[in-house]
């Protein structure tokens, strides 16, 4: 299967490789999932707000995610809230992501408003929606999705975390194809080594 977290890659598949679409993961990008979660679970359990009053703004590394946020099919939070009687069935349709800015856009906003991120407070109460993992941090890097998936697969199959979580061999900044073999000791089979072969394109 091909991952689907990059909307530019997904659009490329839709336009140029339509026959391969059945092999693309049906999972939305993390930003789109976050938008839907914000207007369902977080609206109720974190902010105690009507989901129609929640505005989700994504700050993204690329313009493809702005395009993704504008796709009319991404109204899952609205559908869920209607189906579960959280909002009336005749409520106007709303998107999972209301606004999307690139990191360059937000830097320009900061510049115009005279905000210096380096001079902002560094500590505050951490909210449930602000917690993240190392795998989540590398997700947006080239090869990061694969590295995050490998870390998780290793932990699940071996029953322990990788001693060195950096899997440099799947990072592909300068190559169009990167292949790697990751040996995993299978806990359920007494430590028998399973070689997981992966590729990043």
Please identify what each model-predicted range represents:
Residues 1-201:
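Iron-sulfur-associated redox domains of electron-transfer enzymes in respiratory
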